[in-house]
Amino acid sequence: IFFRDQKITPREQINFAQRFGEIHFHPYMKGLDDHPEILEIIKEPGDGYTFGSVWHTDQMFNPQPAKATMLYAHEVPKTGGDTMFSNQYLAYETLSEPMRDMLNNVKTFNVGDGFRRGIGKAKRIDRYAKNPTMQAKIRDPGNIPTEAVHPLIRTHPETKRKSLYIGSHTQTLDGFNAEEADSIIDFLRNHSQRHEFTCRFRWEAGSIALWDNRCVQHKALADYDEKRRTHRITIAGEIPM
């Protein structure tokens, strides 16, 4: 869901987000000092790393991932900085029946740090070295779980539709050797990003995007070199089934 021309305070953003459920806190990233529910995502001119620039669903490395995300734009570049979204219902439904049958009971192992498909094995703090503003927000997750096993094919608790549940946090597949798992994951990640499944949102200051992580992947485009500042809130979800 997208909204244009909004003017809301941090407190109003939190109040709106809470209509959809309990606020989910990022285990690795500190929120605003006065509103810790909000993660401020900033890229300054010259920064070489864009937060969220690979296809993913938020907090997939948590045993109870965020079910939804709300992003509010404060400052945006004149061009670029769009966000891509991909429909994972369609990603599942367009797989062949034999492929769906093979994958229906497969589990994925997902990690929050030290490994991301499309980026490599660098630790989060090292990946953010080219974006010192975001690097300064990194914290130790402490006892918060940052590894999780999830079904590869997820059933939405409200719509009851099945979707492909995979992303850059997915490290391997239970029951498959490394070569098999890598081949299947690479195929599914490429399949999940097919052009016909996607839409592209062009940000303006005052825009809000609200999406369901249980059936949607997203990706921030790293095609700009101006300041971009957004406020993100994630909503706590249930254990994927």
What role is predicted for each listed range?
Residues 3-210, 214-241:
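Fe(II)/2-oxoglutarate oxygenase catalytic core
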